[in-house]
Amino acid sequence: MYTPEEKARIKWACRRGMLELDVVIMPFFEECFDALNEQEQRDFVSLLECDDPDLFTWVMGHGRSENLGHAAMVDKIVAHNLSKVR
């Protein structure tokens, strides 16, 4: 479980250098992070350490992370955002 201060740092890390990533990652954090289990939360935090071009490639479905935790988290993020569109 993360403290409020840690969650504030995680939220700040959700702010990316690419607007396209901001509109995908931030809503997922705000709406889903607390419902993730501890491992998924760690995977999400670890995913935020990846470079923007890699994240963009994975989110757009043009590639897949070799890290299984990252790949699963990207799948969750994409599914969450698709559910909001439909």
UniProtKB/Swiss-Prot annotation:
One protein family per Pfam: Sdh5
Localization in the cell: Cytoplasm
Keywords in alphabetical order: Chaperone, Cytoplasm
GO BP annotations listed: succinate metabolic process
InterPro entries to which the protein is assigned, alphabetical: SDH, SDH_sf, SdhE_FAD_assembly_factor
GO cellular-component term (any): cytoplasm
Role according to the record: An FAD assembly protein, which accelerates covalent attachment of the cofactor into other proteins. Plays an essential role in the assembly of succinate dehydrogenase (SDH, respiratory complex II), an enzyme complex that is a component of both the tricarboxylic acid cycle and the electron transport chain, and which couples the oxidation of succinate to fumarate with the reduction of ubiquinone (coenzyme Q) to ubiquinol. Required for flavinylation (covalent attachment of FAD) of the flavoprotein subunit SdhA of SDH and other flavinylated proteins as well.
Similarity comment: family membership: Belongs to the SdhE FAD assembly factor family.
Name of the protein this chain belongs to: FAD assembly factor SdhE
Species: Vibrio parahaemolyticus serotype O3:K6 (strain RIMD 2210633)
Top-level taxonomy: Bacteria, Pseudomonadati, Pseudomonadota, Gammaproteobacteria, Vibrionales
